[in-house]
């Protein structure tokens, strides 16, 4: 079995594959201090509690956008699984042609998203929107060339910034409020978060499609934990919540001989 870990600024999203079958997904916060022992014990426990034997994990693949945690990830996998993790980063085989002066700094999670999307939809123009701490937009041509993208503040990050800087505003549940005008402060915050982001998403889709693909057809893919919030708004052609961990698995398989 293959263990995949996507390490983000807010949480770690993990998955276990047996062949092409996704057996398990799980999440753990990545905020605060995380030791290799804490993470290693967590991984063993979550596997066992879901009926999976940690000893049957043969490979570990990781995408990380939190450099400070990388050593922790490495040490926990070595100590508790006896495996050295494969890390997505510059120099690996991806099948993606990334050009530009900042190519080496494209997030590992975004690279993994692209790898998976190209595998699912070969020879198609793709726009991938990943919703997390930040919303990222990545355009991939049908020739597997990275055309560019954008980074937007995420929904939960927007809410946290708002309540930290406005004394009378409190945290609310993030959801579709069903209307843009509300009689309550809670509903007004929810409307601002939802419709403000929805409007930005639509604008980014329109502009990126035009700039990167012209009049050619493209597939818009939504992914990431917060992506489900906008699924009913029909801004995506498809919502694939596990895209990043699939991409990690494929990258690991492509680089076994490296």
Curated annotation (Swiss-Prot):
Residues bound to substrate: 107-110, 185
Q: Tell me the InterPro entries matching this sequence.
A: ATPase_NBD, Type_III_PanK
Which residues bind K(+) per the record?
A: 130
Q: Where in the cell is it found?
A: Cytoplasm
> Key word Metal-binding present in the record?
yes
Kindly report the protein's main subcellular placement as a broad class. Answer: cytoplasm
UniProt keywords (A-Z) are: ATP-binding, Coenzyme A biosynthesis, Cytoplasm, Kinase, Metal-binding, Nucleotide-binding, Potassium, Transferase
**Catalytic residues of the enzyme:** 109
For this protein, the Enzyme Commission number is 2.7.1.33
Q: Which reaction does it catalyse?
A: (R)-pantothenate + ATP = (R)-4'-phosphopantothenate + ADP + H(+)
Give the main EC class: transferase
- PANTHER family on file: TYPE III PANTOTHENATE KINASE
This protein's assembly is summarised as: Homodimer.
Q: Which family does it belong to?
A: Belongs to the type III pantothenate kinase family.
Please identify the protein, giving its name as recorded: Type III pantothenate kinase
Q: Which organism is this protein's natural source?
A: Elusimicrobium minutum (strain Pei191)
State the taxonomy lineage.
Answer: Bacteria, Pseudomonadati, Elusimicrobiota, Elusimicrobia, Elusimicrobiales
